[in-house]
Regions:
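Multi-bladed beta-propeller domains
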Residues: 1-15, 43-59, 84-100, 124-146, ...
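Beta-strand-rich domains and repeat architectures in extracellular enzymes and scaffolds
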Residues: 7-41
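Non-catalytic accessory segments flanking enzyme active sites
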Residues: 16-20, 158-161, 167-168, 195-196, ...
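Blade-terminus and WD-like Trp-Asp/Gly-His loop motifs, strongest in beta-propeller folds
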Residues: 19-27, 62-71, 104-112, 116, ...
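Structural motif
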Residues: 36-41, 79-82, 119-123, 165-170, ...
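Cap/lid segment of the alpha/beta-hydrolase catalytic domain
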Residues: 380-506, 510-512, 519, 554
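Active-site-proximal cap/loop segments of hydrolase catalytic domains
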Residues: 451-454, 467-662
């Protein structure tokens, strides 16, 4: 047996997604990423009868529990839709076809469900299978928001569509006579982007509205009969931009909404009475009540919310409840990261994802009723089966431009790989986003959890590994998130460079062998720092990073999000024609003539988050400059590569690169 984890061990780690309960609370389900895609994991709350559904073709893309029965829809990337019965452990194929479908959402009475087919809203009868497609504005090219459909109790269906290059919310009367001209009962208009519809008890539709280049956010309640709109929440920051995220959630009785807002400089739980429009901040303090970047508080009942918070430790997350009277109660304080809290229908049990220093993400449930809390592990981390325990991270701090920056260090001397060596190689890992945060242990998401797992492999090979939480990330307050506004590509890159210098200062690190790498914004930071701080790192590795900011901006505002919500100009300090020098300075391609060390690149051609043409920019520029580089492209691969074989090849090559550059 090997004395340290292998690449296969790294790739065997599974990543459960956010859990969801059946309507009766007898089952909960979550997708689990393994090998090349998601399977579906379903279990009872006691964990006595787990069931895994793996489709014969393709992988699970989404699932949706019926609102009335313990059945769920399961969609795959092979174009199939199943109705699954976890009690009988059966799956019935109810539709298939080459058309693109997505966003399955059950009606409140459980008799039908909506979805997009080739961009058009479709409603299907759950019993007869009869379908009706509505000839209304289409879904459009932009990425999904948290809610794409929302059903009212009287058969009105709200949905998101795209028109005039921005997102809108419209309402369909699904009971209108078949054959009539399909017209929207109500819709939003204007240049601002509207999304994430939900319904209030008084019949109004509530939704998120953003605009003015990321400077304005409002939560709107609209009367679909009169068109009258009320602003329930208003955020405006014309200098540095809005950095709040997460869709508002409606209370079970439909009279209140809750969301996480940084009104006092830190993300906290807020509730708004939909009738009086009175907003109440329920939590406060110099910490953030948010588990992951797009998280939002969840209703336990009409008077209580549950949420994740780093109030106990900036790099961890624990679960709490808060009443509308502002009384906060700890629910789960297990050391590590506890996120995605989902209360059971009876309010007595909480499902969530847990990860820590010794365990990769697991699905867990804890009792939240009065009495001694009990926790059950519904899935178990395969890290427990490794031949040696993982290296536990150490929180470290260093100064960057007068600011304290922190990160998490894996010291390989904790393992059996090395003893008191004084010439160990080192790696700085840069997360994406930038509104993300590396944690005190495994990250709950696959993207960063996989990187953390691989660095455990590197640490066992004798590499010192540092995860840097640079300016622009979450977990440290609004000012920290807004710190790169107007100076993108400068201040946060200084933080990355200082992380490299910190590693060089360690007496057991070889100062001539410190690498830097990252995915997405981490890839961008790698490309940028090699040109702006060419003497810090010995090699760079870029996965799906940005090289030309103006090229990216044009592509992103056509395919990812509307220009109304795009904060690219704000982050640059102006439009390209206003401050061309800033756009040039923020683009790594501008600085590639300064490269002094080799660069290795990996990118998938099917990337929906960073355009593949960015790799073309890198290759063309470095070829013309006669710089040392290498570039791999993976046909059809995603932003975070989906295939096990792709990651195996990438990780093996990264290891060879690090060894060769020592």
């Amino acid at each position: 047996m090997p004395l340290s984890p292998t690449i296969s061990d790294v790739l065997d780690v599974k990543y459960p997604g956010p859990p969801a309960w059946s309507a009766d609370g007898d089952f909960l389900a979550a997708t689990t990423y393994e090998d090349d895609g998601n399977s579906l994991f379903v279990t009872d709350p006691a964990g006595d009868s787990p069931w895994k559904f793996v489709p014969e073709e393709g992988h699970v893309t989404e699932f949706a529990w019926s609102t009335t029965t313990p059945e769920l829809l399961v969609a795959t990337d092979a174009g199939e839709l199943f109705l699954a019965d976890p009690d009988e452990r059966t799956t019935d194929l109810i539709r298939s076809g080459p058309e693109a479908t997505a966003s399955y959402t059950w009606s409140n009475d459980g008799t039908r469900f909506s979805f997009y087919r080739d961009g058009r809203p479709v409603v299907r009868d759950a019993t007869t299978g009869a379908e009706r497609s509505f000839d209304v504005p289409e879904r459009g090219p932009f990425l999904d928001e948290e809610r794409m459909f929302a059903w009212s109790d009287d058969a009105l269906l709200a949905y998101r569509f795209v028109e005039d290059d921005t997102t809108h919310v419209g309402v369909i009367d699904v009971n209108s006579a078949s054959g009539d001209t399909d017209e929207l009962v109500w819709r939003t208009r204007g240049e601002m982007a509207s999304s994430c519809p939900a319904w209030l008890a008084d019949g109004r539709v509530v939704f998120d509205r953003r605009g003015e280049g990321g400077r304005v956010r409002r939560t709107i309640a609209a009367d679909t009969e009169t068109g009258e709109e009320s602003v329930l929440v208003r955020e405006i920051d014309r200098e540095r931009g809005i950095v709040s995220s997460g869709a508002p959630t409606v209370s079970p009785d439909g009279t209140k909404i809750a969301l996480s807002l940084p009104m006092d400089g830190w993300d906290h739980v807020h509730v708004v009475d939909a009738e009086t429009e009175e907003r109440t901040q329920l939590t406060e303090g110099l910490f953030e009540d948010k588990g992951v970047a797009d998280a939002t508080p969840r209703w336990l009942d009409d008077e209580t919310l549950v949420f994740a918070s780093n109030r106990n430790d900036p790099g961890q997350r624990h679960l709490f409840s808060v009443s509308i009277d502002c009384e906060t109660t700890p629910l789960v304080e297990t050391p590590g990261t506890n996120v995605h809290p989902r209360p059971a229908p009876d309010g007595e049990t909480l499902a969530y994802v847990h990860a820590d220093r010794t365990r990769s993400p697991e699905l867990r449930v804890s009792s939240v009723a009065d009495g001694e809390p009990r926790t059950r592990r519904l899935t178990r981390s395969s890290v427990e089966e490794w031949p040696t325990p993982p290296v536990e991270p150490e929180r470290v701090e260093f100064e960057s431009a007068g600011r304290c920056i922190d990160g998490y260090l894996l010291d390989p001397r904790q393992s059996d790989a090395v003893d008191d060596a004084t010439d160990l190689p080192a790696v700085v890992c840069v997360h994406g986003g930038p509104m993300r945060q590396m944690r005190d242990g495994w990250h709950p998401s696959r993207a960063y959890g996989l990187f953390y797992t691989y660095h455990q492999y590197l640490a066992a090979k004798g590499y010192a590994c540092l995860f840097v939480n640079y300016r622009g990330g979450i977990g440290y307050g609004r000012e920290f998130r807004q710190a790169i506004a107007g100076s993108r590509g400068k201040d946060e890159i200084e933080d990355v460079a200082r992380a490299g210098e910190y590693l060089k200062s360690l007496d057991y690190v070889d100062a001539d062998s410190v690498a830097v790498w990252g995915l997405s914004y981490g890839g961008y930071a790698t490309l940028q720092v090699l040109g702006t701080h060419p003497d810090v790192f010995s090699v760079g590795i870029n996965l799906a990073g940005l090289a030309d900011m103006e090229l990216y901006r044009g592509w992103a505002e056509e395919t990812k999000y509307p220009a109304a919500v795009s904060a690219e100009a704000l982050r640059m300090g102006g439009e390209p024609w206003e401050v061309p020098e800033r756009w040039d300075e923020a683009s790594p391609a501008t600085h590639m003539a300064n490269y002094e060390v080799p660069l290795y690149n990996f990118h998938g051609t099917g990337d929906r988050y960073v355009n593949f043409e960015q790799l073309d920019v890198v290759v063309e520029a470095l070829t013309d400059l006669e710089k040392e580089f290498d570039a791999d492209h993976y046909p059809g691969e995603n932003h975070v590569f989906s295939k096990r074989a792709t990651w195996r090849r990438t990780f093996r090559k990264v290891e060879r690169v690090l060894e060769d550059e020592r």
